Protein backbone atom coordinates (compact mmCIF):
# COMPACT_ATOMS: atom_id res chain seq x y z
CA UNK A 1 0.00 0.00 0.00
CA UNK A 2 1.46 3.36 -1.00
CA UNK A 3 1.19 6.29 1.40
CA UNK A 4 1.00 9.86 0.21
CA UNK A 5 3.76 12.26 1.25
CA UNK A 6 1.48 13.80 3.87
CA UNK A 7 0.48 10.41 5.32
CA UNK A 8 4.13 9.37 5.43
CA UNK A 9 5.02 12.55 7.28
CA UNK A 10 2.21 12.00 9.81
CA UNK A 11 3.25 8.39 10.39
CA UNK A 12 6.88 9.40 10.92
CA UNK A 13 5.87 12.03 13.49
CA UNK A 14 3.61 9.53 15.29
CA UNK A 15 6.49 6.99 15.42
CA UNK A 16 8.86 9.70 16.67
CA UNK A 17 6.38 10.65 19.39
CA UNK A 18 6.01 6.98 20.39
CA UNK A 19 9.79 6.45 20.62
CA UNK A 20 10.34 9.63 22.63
CA UNK A 21 7.44 9.22 25.05
CA UNK A 22 8.46 5.60 25.76
CA UNK A 23 12.10 6.52 26.51
CA UNK A 24 13.78 5.13 23.40
CA UNK A 25 16.01 8.24 23.23
CA UNK A 26 18.73 6.78 21.06
CA UNK A 27 16.35 5.26 18.56
CA UNK A 28 14.41 8.53 18.63
CA UNK A 29 17.37 10.72 17.71
CA UNK A 30 18.52 8.32 14.93
CA UNK A 31 15.00 8.06 13.53
CA UNK A 32 14.46 11.84 13.69
CA UNK A 33 17.67 12.40 11.77
CA UNK A 34 16.99 9.71 9.15
CA UNK A 35 13.39 10.76 8.63
CA UNK A 36 14.52 14.42 8.45
CA UNK A 37 11.95 15.58 10.99
CA UNK A 38 12.07 19.18 12.15
CA UNK A 39 10.73 18.95 15.68
CA UNK A 40 8.17 21.54 16.62
CA UNK A 41 6.70 21.35 20.15
CA UNK A 42 3.29 22.74 19.11
CA UNK A 43 2.99 20.50 16.06
CA UNK A 44 4.10 17.40 17.94
CA UNK A 45 1.37 17.73 20.58
CA UNK A 46 -1.03 16.82 17.78
CA UNK A 47 0.72 13.44 17.35
CA UNK A 48 0.90 12.54 21.02
CA UNK A 49 -0.34 8.95 21.47
CA UNK A 50 -1.51 8.76 17.86
CA UNK A 51 0.24 5.47 17.04
CA UNK A 52 -1.41 3.67 19.99
CA UNK A 53 -4.80 5.12 19.04
CA UNK A 54 -4.47 3.93 15.45
CA UNK A 55 -3.34 0.49 16.62
CA UNK A 56 -6.29 -0.04 18.97
CA UNK A 57 -8.81 1.30 16.44
CA UNK A 58 -7.52 -1.19 13.82
CA UNK A 59 -8.09 -4.07 16.27
CA UNK A 60 -11.57 -2.72 17.04
CA UNK A 61 -12.39 -2.48 13.33
CA UNK A 62 -11.11 -5.98 12.69
CA UNK A 63 -13.40 -7.32 15.39
CA UNK A 64 -16.34 -5.40 13.90
CA UNK A 65 -15.57 -6.75 10.40
CA UNK A 66 -15.54 -10.31 11.74
CA UNK A 67 -18.89 -9.77 13.48
CA UNK A 68 -20.43 -8.36 10.29
CA UNK A 69 -19.04 -11.22 8.21
CA UNK A 70 -20.64 -13.80 10.47
CA UNK A 71 -23.96 -11.88 10.34
CA UNK A 72 -23.74 -11.80 6.55
CA UNK A 73 -23.15 -15.54 6.39
CA UNK A 74 -26.14 -16.08 8.64
CA UNK A 75 -28.30 -13.87 6.42
CA UNK A 76 -27.12 -15.75 3.33
CA UNK A 77 -27.99 -19.04 4.99
CA UNK A 78 -31.43 -17.71 5.88
CA UNK A 79 -31.91 -16.40 2.34
CA UNK A 80 -31.15 -19.77 0.75
CA UNK A 81 -33.25 -21.75 3.18
CA UNK A 82 -36.03 -19.18 2.84
CA UNK A 83 -36.60 -18.72 6.55
CA UNK A 84 -34.85 -18.13 9.88
CA UNK A 85 -32.15 -20.67 10.70
CA UNK A 86 -33.41 -24.07 11.65
CA UNK A 87 -36.83 -23.29 10.20
CA UNK A 88 -36.66 -24.90 6.78
CA UNK A 89 -39.66 -23.89 4.69
CA UNK A 90 -42.13 -26.49 3.61
CA UNK A 91 -41.96 -26.84 -0.23
CA UNK A 92 -45.66 -25.87 -0.21
CA UNK A 93 -44.49 -22.43 0.88
CA UNK A 94 -41.56 -22.01 -1.49
CA UNK A 95 -41.83 -18.83 -3.50
CA UNK A 96 -39.68 -17.34 -6.27
CA UNK A 97 -36.65 -15.41 -4.99
CA UNK A 98 -34.56 -12.82 -6.81
CA UNK A 99 -32.32 -12.67 -8.67
CA UNK A 100 -33.36 -14.92 -11.57
CA UNK A 101 -31.39 -18.13 -12.09
CA UNK A 102 -31.26 -17.60 -15.87
CA UNK A 103 -32.21 -14.84 -18.31
CA UNK A 104 -32.52 -16.52 -21.69
CA UNK A 105 -32.21 -14.59 -24.94
CA UNK A 106 -32.92 -15.84 -28.43
CA UNK A 107 -36.34 -14.57 -29.44
CA UNK A 108 -36.31 -11.57 -31.75
CA UNK A 109 -39.71 -10.20 -30.68
CA UNK A 110 -41.79 -10.13 -27.49
CA UNK A 111 -42.33 -13.47 -25.73
CA UNK A 112 -46.06 -14.23 -25.56
CA UNK A 113 -46.24 -17.45 -23.52
CA UNK A 114 -43.98 -19.66 -21.40
CA UNK A 115 -44.84 -23.17 -20.15
CA UNK A 116 -43.05 -26.05 -18.43
CA UNK A 117 -42.97 -29.55 -19.89
CA UNK A 118 -44.98 -31.93 -17.65
CA UNK A 119 -42.22 -34.58 -17.55
CA UNK A 120 -38.80 -33.42 -18.77
CA UNK A 121 -36.67 -30.58 -17.42
CA UNK A 122 -37.50 -28.35 -20.37
CA UNK A 123 -39.75 -25.38 -20.91
CA UNK A 124 -41.15 -23.87 -24.06
CA UNK A 125 -41.61 -20.25 -25.08
CA UNK A 126 -43.75 -18.73 -27.84
CA UNK A 127 -43.08 -15.38 -29.43
CA UNK A 128 -44.29 -12.71 -31.81
CA UNK A 129 -41.28 -13.71 -33.96
CA UNK A 130 -43.48 -16.67 -35.17
CA UNK A 131 -41.27 -19.27 -33.45
CA UNK A 132 -41.48 -21.63 -30.49
CA UNK A 133 -38.25 -22.27 -28.59
CA UNK A 134 -37.33 -25.15 -26.28
CA UNK A 135 -34.97 -24.58 -23.33
CA UNK A 136 -33.53 -26.68 -20.52
CA UNK A 137 -34.56 -24.83 -17.36
CA UNK A 138 -32.00 -26.61 -15.14
CA UNK A 139 -28.95 -25.69 -17.21
CA UNK A 140 -30.26 -22.63 -19.06
CA UNK A 141 -29.33 -24.24 -22.39
CA UNK A 142 -31.23 -23.47 -25.58
CA UNK A 143 -32.32 -26.72 -27.22
CA UNK A 144 -34.18 -26.01 -30.46
CA UNK A 145 -36.62 -23.82 -32.41
CA UNK A 146 -39.93 -25.02 -33.86
CA UNK A 147 -40.81 -23.13 -37.03
CA UNK A 148 -44.03 -23.35 -39.00
CA UNK A 149 -46.30 -20.47 -38.06
CA UNK A 150 -46.17 -17.40 -40.29
CA UNK A 151 -47.24 -14.84 -37.67
CA UNK A 152 -47.04 -14.28 -33.91
CA UNK A 153 -47.44 -17.48 -31.86
CA UNK A 154 -49.98 -16.57 -29.17
CA UNK A 155 -50.29 -19.62 -26.92
CA UNK A 156 -48.93 -23.14 -26.41
CA UNK A 157 -50.12 -26.17 -24.44
CA UNK A 158 -48.84 -29.68 -23.67
CA UNK A 159 -50.94 -32.78 -23.27
CA UNK A 160 -50.53 -34.56 -19.89
CA UNK A 161 -47.81 -36.88 -21.24
CA UNK A 162 -45.80 -34.09 -22.84
CA UNK A 163 -45.66 -35.98 -26.14
CA UNK A 164 -47.88 -33.48 -27.95
CA UNK A 165 -47.63 -29.70 -28.06
CA UNK A 166 -50.40 -27.49 -29.45
CA UNK A 167 -49.76 -23.93 -30.62
CA UNK A 168 -51.95 -21.18 -32.02
CA UNK A 169 -51.13 -18.07 -33.94
CA UNK A 170 -52.21 -14.76 -35.40
CA UNK A 171 -51.86 -16.61 -38.74
CA UNK A 172 -55.35 -18.01 -37.83
CA UNK A 173 -54.13 -21.62 -37.48
CA UNK A 174 -53.60 -24.13 -34.70
CA UNK A 175 -50.70 -26.54 -35.03
CA UNK A 176 -50.10 -29.85 -33.31
CA UNK A 177 -46.47 -30.89 -32.82
CA UNK A 178 -44.97 -34.26 -32.05
CA UNK A 179 -42.71 -33.21 -29.16
CA UNK A 180 -40.53 -36.30 -29.52
CA UNK A 181 -39.62 -35.75 -33.16
CA UNK A 182 -40.26 -31.98 -33.00
CA UNK A 183 -42.34 -32.06 -36.17
CA UNK A 184 -45.65 -30.43 -36.98
CA UNK A 185 -48.10 -33.29 -37.50
CA UNK A 186 -51.30 -31.33 -38.08
CA UNK A 187 -52.51 -27.82 -38.90
CA UNK A 188 -56.10 -26.82 -38.12
CA UNK A 189 -57.92 -24.09 -40.01
CA UNK A 190 -61.35 -22.75 -39.08
CA UNK A 191 -61.04 -19.52 -37.12
CA UNK A 192 -61.62 -16.29 -39.05
CA UNK A 193 -59.16 -14.17 -37.07
CA UNK A 194 -56.13 -14.24 -34.76
CA UNK A 195 -56.21 -17.40 -32.58
CA UNK A 196 -55.25 -16.08 -29.15
CA UNK A 197 -55.39 -19.17 -26.95
CA UNK A 198 -55.13 -22.94 -27.12
CA UNK A 199 -55.30 -25.79 -24.60
CA UNK A 200 -55.19 -29.57 -24.91
CA UNK A 201 -58.05 -31.12 -22.93
CA UNK A 202 -57.08 -33.35 -19.95
CA UNK A 203 -58.10 -36.55 -21.77
CA UNK A 204 -55.73 -35.67 -24.62
CA UNK A 205 -58.39 -36.35 -27.31
CA UNK A 206 -59.44 -32.77 -27.96
CA UNK A 207 -58.03 -29.26 -28.21
CA UNK A 208 -59.88 -26.03 -27.38
CA UNK A 209 -59.02 -22.71 -28.95
CA UNK A 210 -60.19 -19.11 -28.55
CA UNK A 211 -60.05 -16.39 -31.15
CA UNK A 212 -60.50 -12.74 -31.98
CA UNK A 213 -63.43 -13.99 -34.12
CA UNK A 214 -65.34 -14.13 -30.75
CA UNK A 215 -65.68 -17.94 -30.77
CA UNK A 216 -64.23 -20.89 -28.90
CA UNK A 217 -63.73 -24.07 -30.92
CA UNK A 218 -63.10 -27.67 -29.96
CA UNK A 219 -61.02 -29.88 -32.25
CA UNK A 220 -60.41 -33.61 -32.46
CA UNK A 221 -56.71 -34.41 -32.02
CA UNK A 222 -56.88 -37.56 -34.17
CA UNK A 223 -58.45 -35.95 -37.25
CA UNK A 224 -57.97 -32.21 -36.81
CA UNK A 225 -61.72 -31.69 -37.34
CA UNK A 226 -63.61 -28.95 -35.51
CA UNK A 227 -66.34 -30.74 -33.53
CA UNK A 228 -67.85 -27.89 -31.47
CA UNK A 229 -68.11 -24.11 -31.53
CA UNK A 230 -69.02 -22.15 -28.39
CA UNK A 231 -70.55 -18.74 -29.09
CA UNK A 232 -71.61 -16.05 -26.64
CA UNK A 233 -68.73 -13.65 -26.11
CA UNK A 234 -69.36 -10.30 -27.74
CA UNK A 235 -65.72 -9.49 -28.42
CA UNK A 236 -62.25 -11.00 -28.84
CA UNK A 237 -61.83 -14.13 -26.65
CA UNK A 238 -58.43 -13.81 -24.99
CA UNK A 239 -57.91 -17.10 -23.20
CA UNK A 240 -59.54 -20.50 -22.79
CA UNK A 241 -58.67 -23.10 -20.13
CA UNK A 242 -60.28 -26.48 -19.26
CA UNK A 243 -60.80 -27.52 -15.65
CA UNK A 244 -58.99 -30.56 -14.18
CA UNK A 245 -61.46 -33.21 -15.36
CA UNK A 246 -62.29 -31.53 -18.67
CA UNK A 247 -66.04 -31.20 -18.02
CA UNK A 248 -65.90 -27.39 -17.98
CA UNK A 249 -63.97 -24.76 -19.89
CA UNK A 250 -63.48 -21.15 -18.82
CA UNK A 251 -62.88 -18.26 -21.17
CA UNK A 252 -62.25 -14.54 -20.83
CA UNK A 253 -62.72 -11.73 -23.27
CA UNK A 254 -62.42 -8.10 -24.31
CA UNK A 255 -66.15 -7.92 -23.45
CA UNK A 256 -64.95 -7.74 -19.80
CA UNK A 257 -66.57 -11.05 -18.83
CA UNK A 258 -65.39 -14.49 -17.82
CA UNK A 259 -67.59 -17.35 -18.99
CA UNK A 260 -67.74 -20.97 -17.89
CA UNK A 261 -69.08 -23.52 -20.36
CA UNK A 262 -70.29 -27.10 -19.96
CA UNK A 263 -68.32 -29.07 -22.55
CA UNK A 264 -70.94 -31.78 -23.11
CA UNK A 265 -73.83 -29.41 -23.88
CA UNK A 266 -71.97 -26.22 -24.98
CA UNK A 267 -74.18 -24.24 -22.59
CA UNK A 268 -72.79 -21.23 -20.76
CA UNK A 269 -73.03 -22.23 -17.09
CA UNK A 270 -71.84 -18.89 -15.66
CA UNK A 271 -71.12 -15.39 -16.85
CA UNK A 272 -68.86 -13.62 -14.36
CA UNK A 273 -68.96 -9.86 -14.70
CA UNK A 274 -67.21 -7.56 -12.27
CA UNK A 275 -64.07 -6.53 -14.12
CA UNK A 276 -64.05 -3.02 -15.54
CA UNK A 277 -61.76 -3.66 -18.50
CA UNK A 278 -60.57 -6.44 -20.84
CA UNK A 279 -60.01 -9.73 -18.97
CA UNK A 280 -56.59 -11.00 -20.11
CA UNK A 281 -56.08 -14.26 -18.23
CA UNK A 282 -57.78 -17.00 -16.24
CA UNK A 283 -56.68 -20.00 -14.21
CA UNK A 284 -58.52 -22.80 -12.42
CA UNK A 285 -57.75 -23.45 -8.76
CA UNK A 286 -56.21 -26.89 -8.13
CA UNK A 287 -58.14 -29.07 -5.69
CA UNK A 288 -55.19 -28.79 -3.28
CA UNK A 289 -56.23 -25.17 -2.71
CA UNK A 290 -59.95 -25.74 -2.05
CA UNK A 291 -59.69 -26.01 1.73
CA UNK A 292 -57.48 -22.89 1.95
CA UNK A 293 -59.90 -20.97 -0.29
CA UNK A 294 -62.97 -22.03 1.71
CA UNK A 295 -61.18 -21.00 4.90
CA UNK A 296 -60.05 -17.68 3.44
CA UNK A 297 -63.41 -16.73 1.95
CA UNK A 298 -65.80 -18.42 4.35
CA UNK A 299 -67.60 -19.87 1.32
CA UNK A 300 -70.19 -22.37 2.49
CA UNK A 301 -69.83 -25.97 1.48
CA UNK A 302 -72.67 -26.83 -0.87
CA UNK A 303 -75.18 -29.63 -0.36
CA UNK A 304 -72.92 -31.95 -2.35
CA UNK A 305 -70.37 -31.34 0.41
CA UNK A 306 -67.65 -30.38 -2.03
CA UNK A 307 -66.46 -26.78 -2.39
CA UNK A 308 -65.57 -25.17 -5.70
CA UNK A 309 -64.75 -25.11 -8.46
CA UNK A 310 -62.85 -21.84 -8.15
CA UNK A 311 -61.40 -19.66 -10.85
CA UNK A 312 -58.94 -16.76 -11.00
CA UNK A 313 -59.05 -13.93 -13.51
CA UNK A 314 -56.65 -11.07 -14.23
CA UNK A 315 -57.64 -7.92 -16.05
CA UNK A 316 -56.53 -4.66 -17.61
CA UNK A 317 -58.38 -3.02 -14.70
CA UNK A 318 -55.18 -4.03 -12.78
CA UNK A 319 -57.02 -6.41 -10.45
CA UNK A 320 -57.12 -10.16 -9.86
CA UNK A 321 -60.45 -11.71 -8.92
CA UNK A 322 -61.30 -15.08 -7.43
CA UNK A 323 -64.66 -16.63 -8.30
CA UNK A 324 -66.79 -19.46 -6.98
CA UNK A 325 -68.05 -20.90 -10.26
CA UNK A 326 -70.95 -22.80 -8.66
CA UNK A 327 -72.52 -19.58 -7.33
CA UNK A 328 -71.07 -17.06 -9.80
CA UNK A 329 -69.87 -15.01 -6.83
CA UNK A 330 -66.69 -12.97 -6.79
CA UNK A 331 -64.99 -14.10 -3.55
CA UNK A 332 -62.20 -11.52 -3.48
CA UNK A 333 -60.36 -8.87 -5.43
CA UNK A 334 -56.59 -8.47 -5.11
CA UNK A 335 -55.33 -4.96 -5.77
CA UNK A 336 -51.66 -4.03 -6.10
CA UNK A 337 -50.47 -4.20 -9.71
CA UNK A 338 -49.93 -0.81 -11.33
CA UNK A 339 -50.79 -1.92 -14.86
CA UNK A 340 -52.60 -4.60 -16.87
CA UNK A 341 -52.48 -8.06 -15.29
CA UNK A 342 -51.28 -10.54 -17.91
CA UNK A 343 -50.85 -13.84 -16.08
CA UNK A 344 -52.26 -15.40 -12.93
CA UNK A 345 -52.11 -18.87 -11.38
CA UNK A 346 -52.21 -20.78 -8.12
CA UNK A 347 -49.06 -21.86 -6.36
CA UNK A 348 -48.97 -25.67 -6.43
CA UNK A 349 -49.06 -25.66 -2.60
CA UNK A 350 -52.50 -24.01 -2.82
CA UNK A 351 -51.82 -21.18 -0.34
CA UNK A 352 -50.54 -18.49 -2.67
CA UNK A 353 -51.36 -16.89 -6.00
CA UNK A 354 -48.70 -15.76 -8.48
CA UNK A 355 -49.29 -13.04 -11.04
CA UNK A 356 -47.42 -11.00 -13.62
CA UNK A 357 -48.29 -7.72 -15.25
CA UNK A 358 -47.37 -4.81 -17.48
CA UNK A 359 -45.91 -3.08 -14.39
CA UNK A 360 -42.87 -5.36 -15.09
CA UNK A 361 -43.34 -7.30 -11.85
CA UNK A 362 -43.97 -10.85 -10.72
CA UNK A 363 -46.03 -10.90 -7.51
CA UNK A 364 -46.84 -13.48 -4.87
CA UNK A 365 -50.13 -13.05 -3.01
CA UNK A 366 -51.13 -14.49 0.33
CA UNK A 367 -54.83 -14.58 -0.56
CA UNK A 368 -55.92 -15.63 2.93
CA UNK A 369 -54.86 -12.18 4.15
CA UNK A 370 -55.57 -10.54 0.76
CA UNK A 371 -52.08 -9.05 0.62
CA UNK A 372 -49.18 -9.03 -1.78
CA UNK A 373 -46.36 -10.69 0.16
CA UNK A 374 -43.58 -10.40 -2.42
CA UNK A 375 -42.92 -8.27 -5.47
CA UNK A 376 -40.09 -9.14 -7.86
CA UNK A 377 -38.99 -6.60 -10.44
CA UNK A 378 -38.87 -9.32 -13.04
CA UNK A 379 -38.16 -7.75 -16.41
CA UNK A 380 -37.16 -4.55 -18.21
CA UNK A 381 -40.55 -4.46 -19.95
CA UNK A 382 -44.10 -5.84 -19.63
CA UNK A 383 -44.26 -9.38 -18.21
CA UNK A 384 -46.61 -11.27 -20.53
CA UNK A 385 -46.71 -14.77 -19.08
CA UNK A 386 -45.70 -17.00 -16.19
CA UNK A 387 -45.78 -20.68 -15.28
CA UNK A 388 -45.15 -22.52 -12.02
CA UNK A 389 -43.69 -26.02 -12.19
CA UNK A 390 -45.97 -28.66 -10.71
CA UNK A 391 -43.20 -30.49 -8.82
CA UNK A 392 -39.83 -28.72 -9.21
CA UNK A 393 -39.14 -25.41 -7.40
CA UNK A 394 -39.16 -23.17 -10.48
CA UNK A 395 -41.16 -20.31 -11.95
CA UNK A 396 -40.64 -19.08 -15.50
CA UNK A 397 -41.62 -15.68 -16.93
CA UNK A 398 -41.68 -14.22 -20.44
CA UNK A 399 -41.62 -10.58 -21.44
CA UNK A 400 -41.88 -7.95 -24.14
CA UNK A 401 -38.13 -7.44 -23.45
CA UNK A 402 -37.72 -10.66 -25.55
CA UNK A 403 -36.24 -12.67 -22.67
CA UNK A 404 -37.39 -15.72 -20.76
CA UNK A 405 -36.38 -15.85 -17.09
CA UNK A 406 -36.15 -18.83 -14.76
CA UNK A 407 -36.68 -18.14 -11.04
CA UNK A 408 -35.76 -20.55 -8.29
CA UNK A 409 -38.20 -20.99 -5.42
CA UNK A 410 -37.19 -21.57 -1.83
UniProtKB/Swiss-Prot annotation:
One of its GO terms (biological process) is reelin-mediated signaling pathway. Residues 1-38 are annotated as: Required for self-association and interaction with PAFAH1B2 and PAFAH1B3. Fairly ubiquitous expression in both the frontal and occipital areas of the brain. Residues 7-39 form the LisH domain. Pfam families: LisH_PAC1, WD40. It is found in: Cytoplasm, Cytoskeleton; Cytoplasm, Cytoskeleton, Microtubule organizing center, Centrosome; Cytoplasm, Cytoskeleton, Spindle; Nucleus membrane. CDD domains: WD40 (cd00200). One of its GO terms (cellular component) is nuclear envelope. The keyword Cell cycle applies. SMART domains: LisH (SM00667), WD40 (SM00320). Residues 1-66 are annotated as: Interaction with NDE1. Residues 83-410 are annotated as: Interaction with dynein and dynactin. The modification N6-acetyllysine is found at residue 53. Changing residue 149 to R: In LIS1; abrogates interaction with NDE1 and reduces neuronal migration in vitro. Keywords: Acetylation, Cell cycle, Cell division, Coiled coil, Cytoplasm, Cytoskeleton, Developmental protein, Differentiation, Disease variant, Lipid degradation, Lipid metabolism, Lissencephaly, Membrane, Microtubule, Mitosis, Neurogenesis, Nucleus, Phosphoprotein, Repeat, Transport, WD repeat. WD repeats lie at residues 106-147, 148-187, 190-229, 232-271, 274-333, 336-377, 378-410. PANTHER family: WD REPEAT-CONTAINING PROTEIN POP1. Component of the cytosolic PAF-AH (I) heterotetrameric enzyme, which is composed of PAFAH1B1 (beta), PAFAH1B2 (alpha2) and PAFAH1B3 (alpha1) subunits. The catalytic activity of the enzyme resides in the alpha1 (PAFAH1B3) and alpha2 (PAFAH1B2) subunits, whereas the beta subunit (PAFAH1B1) has regulatory activity. Trimer formation is not essential for the catalytic activity. It is linked to Lissencephaly 1: A classical lissencephaly. It is characterized by agyria or pachygyria and disorganization of the clear neuronal lamination of normal six-layered cortex. The cortex is abnormally thick and poorly organized with 4 primitive layers. Associated with enlarged and dysmorphic ventricles and often hypoplasia of the corpus callosum. Subcortical band heterotopia: SBH is a mild brain malformation of the lissencephaly spectrum. It is characterized by bilateral and symmetric plates or bands of gray matter found in the central white matter between the cortex and cerebral ventricles, cerebral convolutions usually appearing normal. Dimerization mediated by the LisH domain may be required to activate dynein. Belongs to the WD repeat LIS1/nudF family. Originally the subunits of the type I platelet-activating factor (PAF) acetylhydrolase was named alpha (PAFAH1B1), beta (PAFAH1B2) and gamma (PAFAH1B3). Now these subunits have been renamed beta (PAFAH1B1), alpha2 (PAFAH1B2) and alpha1 (PAFAH1B3) respectively. This is Platelet-activating factor acetylhydrolase IB subunit beta. The gene is PAFAH1B1.
